[in-house]
């Protein structure tokens, strides 16, 4: 870390803690920041734009304009009694002359292409020509709407070509801007234009960078909003508090330079770190979003603070140096405060937005998990249990789409209410000033001189109003009126004393609801924070419980004098918990009373089964009154169901071994098993799990778990990993990814079967079946259908991508629906479905089609082992290994007529990995298809394995079990990939192929060197005690495994 960073690193932690607090209470922080910024926004804009102070009541019969403003818009003419000429006066001069005869001359032109149109009748008309009327009155009257005798409505318009005369608005804006910029030379204008172009490029880069890290719009918009809030707060501070206002022109010129210099790189880096951290976090780590935001700010905050402090010191220095230039000093002060507020808002407002983005990502990932599990055949109750476990670390209110909409609506509604009044007043002022009036000098008409008008012989002033145009009311005028009326009505309603208070109250209620939901979410977050401690307490409970059991069984023995443990309050609590649960989860009890069977049946029919003791429930099962498979549903306690089933089977099978704990059953999450992995559960089978590695695969290091009971298998694969790493690691290529299901159907005749095959092979048939199949799943996508005929039997092989799930159940659902559509919609009514699976898949059976066409993931893994490593690590030589591989794996397997078995022991590694990682063990039949190739390259050994049918998934099936899921976490591939569906399953297939590569390399080396038997004798025959059966002891049963843990 550089020296400047070291000096400010102590400032990072307060900012990181602030960011974590904001992430915990995002709605609170966002609302407070928006309210403060909105207050500053209203104050600043009212100061900079004075014309917004007009009342919005001009939508009446006559325009209600302030007299002073209307007087300024008129062209004034004066004639004294002693003169016959009219003198042009300014507004100030006309106001200084007092005369009782002051008239307003209005010129009204009716725009109509039809000369026969009936025009409205008007009062005070002194002259008319064609469709133009001149009105002379003592008060200005400009009606917005007139009605002719035939009912035609005429609407006031500046001209008849543009709605609201947007052209004039644009023209006046350009004129004002031109007047301001005329003071600059061309070089300055070029610099300003370049600054705005660079500003546009910076904004484009912001959206592009955010899109790359996973946000299409909202994070970019949030970054801009953060800077805008900082601008408004700094403008309010300098303008209202410090009385150092920066001119509007300086803001227009200087802000692009500030934005370009500072940029948005730090906000992009904060977002990138947070999203990448979220993607790297495995599902079961349960890290909270607030901790991710804390780490992001802690890692990136030093650079953020360093750069902002540098900018702030630069502006302060500039203000001191140029103190003789007030405009520049004020702008430097504004820039300084803008940086300060932007820094604070980055740790509050922007961090809160980031936390909400992460929460939404968690919701999305968890929803994908639940939908995938349900599509893969896991019952909804089990899927919900897993879904809740995955989302337990997230705030509860964000799981509800209604709550998300409520939070967003609160903020968006606030912004709309703030801007509606401003927008309405601005619209009204703009219409009045740029549409109805302009600064043109209007000449006095000639008819004034000869027209017989009373009082014109006296001292008189005539103020000529701008010419007004009226057009017949059309449809688009009505639409415009409706829009303006709605805006005006809402604006007036907001300003109403009662409604404004009601809206404020409603907004307060909205915030209170969000606060309530957030407080409710703390319960779930606190539960997850407490869960690690509760796990420790559970372990203590198990230890204390085991110790209690052993003590009760050996209480006749003398007490140990040297191992006494003091009793604490926690021990008392744990003992009470044990006593409360002992009656439910006890394996056997001699003191349990058993009621008559008839009474038990009667209670069961009244759904009182849960209130019976275990022996009574077991008695119902033994006597055939309660099915063995229905215990979980009836008892609503999966662990108790396992216990009762063991008691019942110990009687039915006359095997008291199930009463003991030699087959363990305690401390296991059977909720994940029920409906997903196994039925009639009586416990679980512990299998030793070893680990090999690290193994470098495509540049990434992995520790790979293996569950096996075969000695020296893990040690052998470990040696292979060491040799592969010495050569730089393994590289992989995935050539195919598609699970298959092969239904068989029958037609009455061969002609119809052949016609259906031709249709399915055609583009029309493929597209029709794809459309039907893809409609059944969010994840499964049909790639291709392969067909073949055997008599009138038609076999179809559906190849489908299934995301990160292995996907057999998912595909079966799509196949069933596709076959149904063929019968009902595509004209194959005479088709008979023989079986959804016609062994053309082929699943869990050796088949050449899997070896040739592939099934699941097709992976090729390769590694180059240096010659000296072959000698030093593998204790062999390159030529011997190449010769062995040809003779054994290629020629030997061919002589045996093997299909896909051109390897040494790929099934060993595949099965061990499948058991450890929750895969279907039966699918090792086709997943173990492998051909191992070796050749010598420049004295080194190049070895590869090609496995065309690895069938794996990282969600569903056995992966829902916590131990297997934890091993997937060890590899970093648990659950669905957050951004690229199927990436985790494909990576798992690569890892399995590389593990097979390591096992093949080590075993072939042992065979070439003649070490195989020796290694097995060493690892599997270490002592004679390992092979001895345990003998009963008079001192009591052996110590339980749970007690040792």
Curated annotation (Swiss-Prot):
Documented effect of changing residue 215 to A/T: Leads to increased stability and reduced response to degradation signals
InterPro entries reported for this sequence: HMG-CoA_N_dom, HMG_CoA_Rdtase, HMG_CoA_Rdtase_cat_sf, HMG_CoA_Rdtase_CS, HMG_CoA_Rdtase_eu_arc, HMG_CoA_Rdtase_N, HMG_CoA_Rdtase_NAD(P)-bd_sf, HMG_CoA_Rdtase_sub-bd_dom_sf
Outcome following mutation: residue 262 to A: Leads to increased stability and reduced response to degradation signals
Active site as annotated: 710, 844, 920, 1016
Transmembrane segments annotated in the record for this chain: 25-45, 187-207, 217-237, 244-264, 302-322, 325-345, 403-423, 498-518
Entry's localization field: Endoplasmic reticulum membrane; Nucleus envelope
Effect of substituting residue 328 to A: Leads to normal response to the FPP-derived signal but no response to the oxysterol signal
Positions bound to CoA: 716-722, 873-875, 1015-1016
Region (Disordered): 1018-1045
Catalysed reaction, written as an equation: (R)-mevalonate + 2 NADP(+) + CoA = (3S)-3-hydroxy-3-methylglutaryl-CoA + 2 NADPH + 2 H(+)
Domain SSD span(s) in chain numbering: 188-356
Consequence of substituting residue 219 to F: Leads to increased stability and reduced response to degradation signals
Pathway given in the UniProt record: Metabolic intermediate biosynthesis; (R)-mevalonate biosynthesis; (R)-mevalonate from acetyl-CoA: step 3/3
PROSITE patterns: HMG_COA_REDUCTASE_1 (PS00066), HMG_COA_REDUCTASE_2 (PS00318), HMG_COA_REDUCTASE_3 (PS01192), HMG_COA_REDUCTASE_4 (PS50065), SSD (PS50156)
Keywords, comma-separated and alphabetical: Endoplasmic reticulum, Glycoprotein, Lipid biosynthesis, Lipid metabolism, Membrane, NADP, Nucleus, Oxidoreductase, Phosphoprotein, Steroid biosynthesis, Steroid metabolism, Sterol biosynthesis, Sterol metabolism, Transmembrane, Transmembrane helix
Enzyme Commission number(s) of this protein: 1.1.1.34
Annotated knockout phenotype: When both HMG1 and HMG2 are deleted, cells are unable to undergo spore germination and vegetative growth.
Further information: Present with 149 molecules/cell in log phase SD medium.
Protein name stated in the entry: 3-hydroxy-3-methylglutaryl-coenzyme A reductase 2
Organism: Saccharomyces cerevisiae (strain ATCC 204508 / S288c)
Name of the gene: HMG2
């Amino acid at each position: 870390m550089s020296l400047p960073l070291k000096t400010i690193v102590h400032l990072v932690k307060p900012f990181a803690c602030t960011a974590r607090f904001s992430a915990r209470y995002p709605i609170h922080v966002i609302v407070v920041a928006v309210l403060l910024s909105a207050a500053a926004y209203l104050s600043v804009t009212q100061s900079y734009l004075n014309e917004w102070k007009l009342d919005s009541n001009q939508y009446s019969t006559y325009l209600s304009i302030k007299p002073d403003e209307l007087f300024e818009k008129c062209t004034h003419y004066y004639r004294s009694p002693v003169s016959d000429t009219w003198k042009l006066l300014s507004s100030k001069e006309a106001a200084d002359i007092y005369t009782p005869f002051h008239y307003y001359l209005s010129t009204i032109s009716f725009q109509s292409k039809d000369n026969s149109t009936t025009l409205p009748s008007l009062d005070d008309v002194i002259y008319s020509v064609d469709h133009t009327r001149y009105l002379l009155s003592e008060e200005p009257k400009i009606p917005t709407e007139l009605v002719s005798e035939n009912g035609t409505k005429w609407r006031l318009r500046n001209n008849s070509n543009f709605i609201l005369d947007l052209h004039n608005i644009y023209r006046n804006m350009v004129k004002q801007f031109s007047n301001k910029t005329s003071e600059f030379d061309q070089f300055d204008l070029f610099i300003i234009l370049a600054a705005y172009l660079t500003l546009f490029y910076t904004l484009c880069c912001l959206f592009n960078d955010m899109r790359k890290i996973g946000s299409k719009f909202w994070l970019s918009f949030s970054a801009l909003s953060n800077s805008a809030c900082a601008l408004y707060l700094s403008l309010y501070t300098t303008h209202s508090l410090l009385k150092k206002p920066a001119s509007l022109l300086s803001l227009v010129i200087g802000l692009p330079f500030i934005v370009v210099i500072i940029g948005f790189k730090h906000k992009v880096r904060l977002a990138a770190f947070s999203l990448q951290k979220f993607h790297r976090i495995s599902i079961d780590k349960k890290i909270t979003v607030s901790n991710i935001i804390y780490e992001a700010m802690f890692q990136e905050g030093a650079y953020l603070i360093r750069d902002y402090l540098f900018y702030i010191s630069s502006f302060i220095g500039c203000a001191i140096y140029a103190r003789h230039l007030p405009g520049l000093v004020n702008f430097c002060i504004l820039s300084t405060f803008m940086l300060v507020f932007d820094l604070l808002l980055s740790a509050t407002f922007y961090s809160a937005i980031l936390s909400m983005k992460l929460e939404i990502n968690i919701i999305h990932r968890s929803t994908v998990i639940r939908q995938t599990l349900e599509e893969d055949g896991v019952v909804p109750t089990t899927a919900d249990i897993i879904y809740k476990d995955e989302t337990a670390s997230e705030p509860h209110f964000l799981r509800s789409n209604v709550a998300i909409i409520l939070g967003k609506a609160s903020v968006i509604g606030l912004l709309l209410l703030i801007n509606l009044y401003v927008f309405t007043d601005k619209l009204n002022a703009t219409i009045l000033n740029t549409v109805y009036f302009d600064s043109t000098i209007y000449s006095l008409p000639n008819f004034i001189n000869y027209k017989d008008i009373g009082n014109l012989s006296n001292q008189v002033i005539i103020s000529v109003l701008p010419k007004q145009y009226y057009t017949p009311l059309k449809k688009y005028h009505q639409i415009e009126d409706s829009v303006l009326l709605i805006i005006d009505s809402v604006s007036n309603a907001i300003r109403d004393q009662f409604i404004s208070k009601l809206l404020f109250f409603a907004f307060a209620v909205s915030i209170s609801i969000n606060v309530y939901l957030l407080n409710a979410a703390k319960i779930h977050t606190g539960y997850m924070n407490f869960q690690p401690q509760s796990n420790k307490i559970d372990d203590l409970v198990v230890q204390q419980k085991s110790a209690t059991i052993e003590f009760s069984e050996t209480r006749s023995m003398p007490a140990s004098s040297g191992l006494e443990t003091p009793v604490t309050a926690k021990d008392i609590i744990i003992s009470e918990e044990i006593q409360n649960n002992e009656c439910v989860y006890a394996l056997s009890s001699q003191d349990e009373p058993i009621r008559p069977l008839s009474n038990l049946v009667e209670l069961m029919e009244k759904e009182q089964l849960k209130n019976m003791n275990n022996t009574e429930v077991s008695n119902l099962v033994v006597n055939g009154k309660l099915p063995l498979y229905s215990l979980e549903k009836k008892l609503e306690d999966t662990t108790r169901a396992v216990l009762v089933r063991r008691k019942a089977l110990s009687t039915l099978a006359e095997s008291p071994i199930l009463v003991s704990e030699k087959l363990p059953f305690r401390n296991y999450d059977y909720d994940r098993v029920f409906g997903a992995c196994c039925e009639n559960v009586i416990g679980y089978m512990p299998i030793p799990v070893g680990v090999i590695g690290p193994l470098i695969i495509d540049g990434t290091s992995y520790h790979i778990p293996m569950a096996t009971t075969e000695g020296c298998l893990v040690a052998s694969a470990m040696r292979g990993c060491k040799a592969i790493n010495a050569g730089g690691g393994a590289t992989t290529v995935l050539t195919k990814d598609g699970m298959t299901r092969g239904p068989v159907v029958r037609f009455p005749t061969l002609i119809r079967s052949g016609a259906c095959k031709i249709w399915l092979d055609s583009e029309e048939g493929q597209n029709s079946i794809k459309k039907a199949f893809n409609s059944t799943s969010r994840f499964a996508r049909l790639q291709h259908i392969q067909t073949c005929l055997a008599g009138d039997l038609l076999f179809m092989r559906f190849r489908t991508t299934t995301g990160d799930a292995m996907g057999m159940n998912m595909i079966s659902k799509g196949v069933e629906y596709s076959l149904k559509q063929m019968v009902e919609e595509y004209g194959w009514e005479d088709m008979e479905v023989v079986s959804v699976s016609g062994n053309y898949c082929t699943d869990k059976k050796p088949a050449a089609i899997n070896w040739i066409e592939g099934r699941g993931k097709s992976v090729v893994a390769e590694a180059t082992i240096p010659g000296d490593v072959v000698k030093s690590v593998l204790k062999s030589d390159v030529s011997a290994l190449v010769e062995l591989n040809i003779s054994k794996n290629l020629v030997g397997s061919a002589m045996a007529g093997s299909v896909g078995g051109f390897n040494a022991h790929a099934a060993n590694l595949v099965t061990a990995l499948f058991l450890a990682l929750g895969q279907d063990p039966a699918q090792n039949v086709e997943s173990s298809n492998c051909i191992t190739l070796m050749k010598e390259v420049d004295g080194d050994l190049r070895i590869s394995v090609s496995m065309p049918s690895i069938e794996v998934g990282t969600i569903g099936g056995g992966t829902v079990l916590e131990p297997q899921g934890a091993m997937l976490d060890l590899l970093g591939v648990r659950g669905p990939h957050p951004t690229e569906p199927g990436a985790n399953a494909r990576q798992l297939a690569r890892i399995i192929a590389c593990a097979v590569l390591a096992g093949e390399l080590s075993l072939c080396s042992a065979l070439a060197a003649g070490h195989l038997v020796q290694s097995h004798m060493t690892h599997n025959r270490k002592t004679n005690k390992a092979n001895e059966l345990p003998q009963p002891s008079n001192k009591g049963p052996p110590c339980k495994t749970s007690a040792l843990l």
